[in-house]
Amino acid sequence: MTLERTFVAIKPDGVQRGLIAEILGRFETKGFKLVGLKQLTPSKELAEKHYGVHKDRPFFSGLVDFITSGPVIAMVWEGEGVIASARKLIGATKPLEAEPGTIRGDLAVNIGRNVIHGSDGSDTAVFEINLWFQENELVDWNPSDQAWRVE
């Protein structure tokens, strides 16, 4: 399996509720490498591009309003199978359908306040990483325990 990268964002509700360390810890404990991290309040333009696939849906403006309502923690994680694994760590979009042990299953309240976003596939990951990060904001590094993470 080859290394891949995925985009993950802790949404304003997760930031306001003090869940940043809890969420970061789950990805680090799993063994993924954090290669990009920043805190920002997204602009309306960034939010509309990010959620562009939903632009004709009735909930689009609510998504944009919410994600721009406060700070977001934008991250890029790297590892073998990180896209699919991140989706499993995150859990179902609707928290009531998310399994216990997942981020949403343990921490999210409802679909409108589901704490976290993660890319749903490789094409989406590339698009979202390039939308939220400049290349020089991503750090290529090797953790000292790398030999203990993968063969």
Curated annotation (Swiss-Prot):
Q: What class of enzyme is it?
A: transferase
Which compartments does it reside in? Cytoplasm
Nucleotide-binding: is it a keyword of this entry?
A: yes
Q: Which residues bind ATP?
A: 11, 59, 87, 93, 104, 114
Major localization class: cytoplasm
Q: Output one GO BP term.
A: GTP biosynthetic process
Q: What cellular component terms from Gene Ontology apply here?
A: cytoplasm
Report the EC number(s), separated by commas if there are several.
Answer: 2.7.4.6
> So where's the catalytic machinery, residue-wise?
117
Q: Which cofactor does this sequence's record say it needs?
A: Mg(2+)
Domain of life where this protein originates: Bacteria
KW Transmembrane helix (keyword) present: no
Q: Which GO terms describe its molecular function?
A: ATP binding; metal ion binding; nucleoside diphosphate kinase activity
Per UniProt, which keywords does this protein have? ATP-binding, Cytoplasm, Kinase, Magnesium, Metal-binding, Nucleotide metabolism, Nucleotide-binding, Phosphoprotein, Transferase
Q: What CDD domains does the database record attribute to this sequence?
A: NDPk_I (cd04413)
Task: Name the chemical reaction catalysed here.
Answer: a 2'-deoxyribonucleoside 5'-diphosphate + ATP = a 2'-deoxyribonucleoside 5'-triphosphate + ADP; a ribonucleoside 5'-diphosphate + ATP = a ribonucleoside 5'-triphosphate + ADP
The UniProt subunit note reads as follows: Homotetramer.
State what this protein does. Major role in the synthesis of nucleoside triphosphates other than ATP. The ATP gamma phosphate is transferred to the NDP beta phosphate via a ping-pong mechanism, using a phosphorylated active-site intermediate.
Membership in a protein family = Belongs to the NDK family.
Task: Name it.
Answer: Nucleoside diphosphate kinase
Its source organism is Prochlorococcus marinus (strain NATL2A)
- What broad taxonomic lineage does this protein's source fall under? Bacteria, Bacillati, Cyanobacteriota, Cyanophyceae, Synechococcales
